[in-house]
């Protein structure tokens, strides 16, 4: 999938698209860590800091927001950083969505991804306040973990969990894996379903 998406992104001439041109970033989005010399947290962290030219410890959120912004530029109209809504500062806004980006590395242990479903509760009033659907965009390890816990479609999404996801959607809150958004970007001639 990563190689086909990279071929597609090479056809885009928009100068605002830069992070998605990095083939290793695209591999990382899809969970392909073959570009790391060793599959260790320290190597993933060093790579992420290098991509952002950011020596500070925290990098995945910033990289995820950059990826999310570029994908939104390709998918939606009028992408911008939204004004603060009451006490909330969401990551992105388009003509139809308020977007909160959730990103996680692949080689970090812990329970951070288990908190992603709570984002829907935290921002439950955003659709009413803005008239726009809240889209919670799960990127990289956050997407993988959201599939494993049943928040996104996959074998772990039981009937009961699907009911919760449906309830969120009925209330203008949707969880979306970045890989699904990337599929929507590509021409049908680049069908990725067989990869």
Where are these regions (language model features)?
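Beta-rich catalytic cores
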Residues: 88
């Amino acid at each position: 999938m990563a190689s086909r998406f990279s071929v597609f992104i090479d056809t885009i001439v928009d100068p605002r698209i830069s992070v998605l041109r990095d083939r290793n970033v695209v591999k990382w989005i899809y969970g392909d860590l073959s570009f790391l010399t060793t599959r260790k947290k320290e190597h993933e962290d060093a790579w992420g800091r290098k991509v952002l030219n950011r020596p500070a410890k925290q990098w995945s959120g910033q990289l995820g927001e950059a990826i999310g912004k570029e994908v939104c530029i390709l998918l939606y109209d009028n992408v911008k950083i939204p004004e603060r809504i009451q006490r909330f500062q969401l990551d992105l806004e388009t003509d139809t969505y308020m977007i909160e980006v959730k990103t996680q590395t692949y080689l970090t242990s812990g329970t951070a991804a288990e908190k992603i479903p709570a984002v829907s509760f935290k921002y439950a009033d955003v659709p009413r306040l803005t008239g726009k659907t809240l889209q919670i965009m799960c990127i990289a390890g956050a997407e993988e973990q959201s599939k494993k816990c049943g928040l996104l479609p996959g074998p772990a999404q039981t009937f009961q969990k699907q009911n919760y996801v449906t309830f969120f959607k009925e209330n203008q809150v949707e969880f979306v894996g970045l890989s699904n958004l990337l599929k929507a970007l590509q021409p049908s001639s680049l069908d990725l379903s067989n990869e």
